[in-house]
């Protein structure tokens, strides 16, 4: 279901870089990804990626998520060439049909009606880029989510309560949206929220970020 780490650049396929004090940048304006990255207790900056998120003709949800995650990391890295940059993207995959952020109440209603009683795969991709070292890796976490057979009333009341219009699939699993679900199957617990931290940790450490550096915070 989920892929292993997939090196994109040949320079990173053989060996990882020695951890240093490289700055870390999150190439995303998502408050959910920012909150997840804060769990690592690492200093980081946030930058907005300027990327066209329009799907290519015939592009699958998985390929779309992978392409956009890498495009976001590369776009931000151009302004932070010495930093380790994280890019991420998530696309809900309903039987091959990509479902992005609804943006409006009406679209969110339509999405949840489509997904009720169905199993949806949330394709969550993350990419890490450091321009000056040539480091580039990406990985994908595929989260299988089965929705309850929701009534129209439940859908309407949920959306009014949580307004998840900036979330792929029109639900916030970290909030009331968990009540919409029958089951979740994945191997990277934070992937459904938008950033697979297990994969992210592996890649930023390989790129030169010291996850367990002594920060001088002794009792």
From Swiss-Prot:
The record marks 32, 90, 174 as: Important for substrate specificity. It catalyses: N(7)-methyl-GTP + H2O = N(7)-methyl-GMP + diphosphate + H(+). It comes from the Bacteria. The active site is at residue 89. GO terms for cellular component: cytoplasm. GO terms for molecular function: nucleoside triphosphate diphosphatase activity. It comes from Polaromonas sp. (strain JS666 / ATCC BAA-500). NCBIfam families: maf. Its cofactor is a divalent metal cation. This is 7-methyl-GTP pyrophosphatase. It is found in: Cytoplasm. Keywords: Cytoplasm, Hydrolase, Nucleotide metabolism. Belongs to the Maf family. YceF subfamily.
């Amino acid at each position: 279901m989920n892929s292993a780490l997939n090196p994109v650049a040949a320079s990173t396929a053989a060996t990882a870089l020695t951890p240093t004090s490289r700055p870390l940048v999150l190439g995303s304006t998502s408050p959910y990804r920012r909150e997840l990255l804060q769990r690592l207790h690492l200093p980081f900056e946030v930058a907005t990626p300027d990327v066209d998120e329009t799907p290519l003709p015939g592009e699958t949800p998985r390929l779309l998520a992978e392409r956009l995650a890498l495009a976001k990391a590369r776009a931000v890295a151009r302004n932070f060439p010495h930093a380790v940059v994280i890019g991420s993207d998530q696309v809900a995959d309903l039987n091959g049909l990509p479902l992005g952020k609804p943006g409006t109440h009406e679209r969110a209603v339509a999405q949840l009606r489509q997904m009720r009683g169905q199993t949806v795969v949330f394709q969550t991709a993350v990419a890490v880029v450091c321009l000056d070292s040539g480091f580039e890796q990406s990985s994908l976490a595929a989260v299988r989510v089965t929705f309850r057979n929701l009534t129209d009333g439940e859908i309407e009341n949920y959306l009014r309560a949580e307004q998840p219009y900036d979330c792929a699939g029109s639900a916030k699993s970290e909030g009331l949206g968990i009540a919409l679900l029958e089951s979740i199957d994945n191997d990277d617990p934070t992937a459904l929220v938008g950033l697979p931290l297990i994969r992210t940790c592996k890649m930023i450490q390989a790129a030169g970020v010291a996850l367990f550096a002594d920060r001088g915070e002794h009792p």
